[in-house]
């Protein structure tokens, strides 16, 4: 089933080279746009140990010509049906198409027993993502997500700090992420872009799935959501381009998420407060820990001064070596299938992000706090209403 080859394996210290026999996962890529081309080049160049590019599905002739010129011996498929007909030539499918096609393509190839690796978001409706997850479980195939931002050293360090309990009991998190500035030229670049009928949403479905994934990765899904969502605030369209979200947890933890595509210069700053101090992640590249000398609980027990402050010290954390986050995700996917290594992000993570996104939209449309997850029927009816409104415009 899998081709074999020898390749160099480096130890963690990268001081020794060890040859060993390794299987290769044969991957077929669907979608040869900007990210699809990037992924294809990485795999073809051997940047992903354990993975080989077996085929690419591309519908336009210019892309097909480029594929044949730059990727010799890689099969080019004109459409998904032609690719499915050659199912014996690949083991897994990487889906890098517009997100509205992720679910039907995933179902098509899962039914053939092919492992799936999907770009974000997994799908539009959480109910549809659940259906794909169920199909993958039925067929015994892997379902991975390309949530590459989890592999950035800063976010990995933040996750390790949270998991270790270094912040104590968590109280609050505030994430301001408005570094997504998009000019009208971007929104006009394709007829389907920034529309309810084409993309089924705007800012929260296009730009923010990575950060919603990391929110639930760090803190879990909230119990309730309230979204103050603005539609076409900075642009002449009907979808969302600015949002202020409140996440509520039964534990008492509270979160705020602020994002927009029409503000510049923007920032990407996450601050998390716990009983033992504050963690700051700046631009996804630097991490600071402002550590209390005593936790707020301990200080409250021993302090006798009326306006006392807790002594604290700010330090920057040393981060691990920066590696290509996409290569890490792809190699992990291959190792999961070939060796049983746990996935960095699987279909359940794609489902959680879809559930959170659906809840945010429903809250924004109805201007009320909603429980997570919401009923799929409510979300889908709300989406259809906005699509119909857009079509009448």
Q: Where are each of the predicted segments found?
A:
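C-terminal capping/lid region of NAD(P)-dependent oxidoreductase domains
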Residues: 22, 141, 168-172, 362-382, ...
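N-terminal Rossmann-like dinucleotide-binding module
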Residues: 10-71
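Rossmann-fold dehydrogenase core element
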Residues: 131-148, 169-172
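C-terminal glycine/acidic-rich active-site capping loop/insertion
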Residues: 24, 274-348, 370, 381-393
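Beta-loop-alpha module in the N-terminal Rossmann-like domain of NAD(P)-dependent dehydrogenases
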Residues: 71-135
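Predominantly a Rossmann-like dinucleotide-binding segment in NAD(P)-dependent oxidoreductases
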Residues: 149-236, 367
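Glycine-rich phosphate/pyrophosphate-binding beta-alpha loops
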Residues: 209, 234, 258-266
């Amino acid at each position: 089933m899998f081709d074999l080859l020898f390749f160099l394996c480096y130890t963690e210290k990268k001081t020794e080279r060890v040859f060993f026999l390794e299987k290769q996962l044969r991957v077929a890529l669907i979608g040869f746009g900007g990210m699809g081309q990037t992924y294809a080049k990485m795999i073809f160049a051997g940047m992903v140990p354990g993975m080989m590019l077996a085929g690419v599905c591309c519908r336009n002739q210019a892309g097909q010509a480029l594929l044949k010129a730059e990727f010799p011996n890689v099969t080019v498929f004109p459409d998904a049906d032609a690719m499915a007909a050659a199912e014996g030539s690949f083991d897994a499918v990487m889906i890098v198409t517009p997100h509205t096609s992720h679910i039907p393509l995933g179902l098509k190839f899962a039914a053939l027993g092919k492992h799936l690796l999907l770009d974000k978001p997994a799908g539009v409706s959480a109910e549809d993502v659940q259906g794909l997850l169920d199909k993958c479980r039925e067929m015994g195939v892997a379902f991975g997500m390309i949530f590459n931002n989890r592999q950035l050293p800063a976010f990995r360090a933040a996750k390790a700090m949270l998991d270790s309990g270094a912040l104590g009991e968590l109280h609050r998190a505030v994430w301001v992420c408005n570094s997504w500035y998009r000019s009208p030229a971007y929104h006009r670049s394709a007829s389907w872009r920034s529309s309810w009928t084409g993309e089924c949403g705007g800012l929260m479905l296009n730009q923010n799935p990575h950060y919603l994934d990391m929110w639930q990765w760090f803190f879990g899904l909230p119990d309730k959501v309230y979204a103050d969502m603005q539609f076409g605030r900075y642009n002449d369209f009907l979808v969302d381009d600015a949002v202020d979200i409140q996440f509520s947890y039964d534990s008492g933890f509270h979160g705020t998420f602020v994002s927009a595509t029409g503000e510049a210069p923007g920032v990407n700053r996450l601050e998390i407060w716990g009983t033992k101090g504050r963690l700051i992640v700046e631009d996804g590249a630097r991490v600071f820990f402002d550590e209390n000398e005593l936790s707020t609980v301990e200080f409250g027990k021993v302090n006798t001064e009326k306006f006392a402050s807790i002594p604290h010290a700010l330090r920057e954390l040393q981060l691990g070596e920066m590696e290509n986050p996409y290569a890490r995700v792809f190699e992990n996917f291959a190792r999961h299938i070939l060796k049983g290594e746990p996935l960095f992000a699987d279909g359940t993570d794609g489902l959680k992000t879809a559930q959170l996104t659906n809840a945010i939209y429903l809250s924004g449309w109805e201007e009320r706090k909603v429980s997570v997850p919401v009923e799929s029927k409510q979300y889908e009816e709300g989406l259809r209403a906005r699509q119909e409104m857009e079509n009448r415009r």
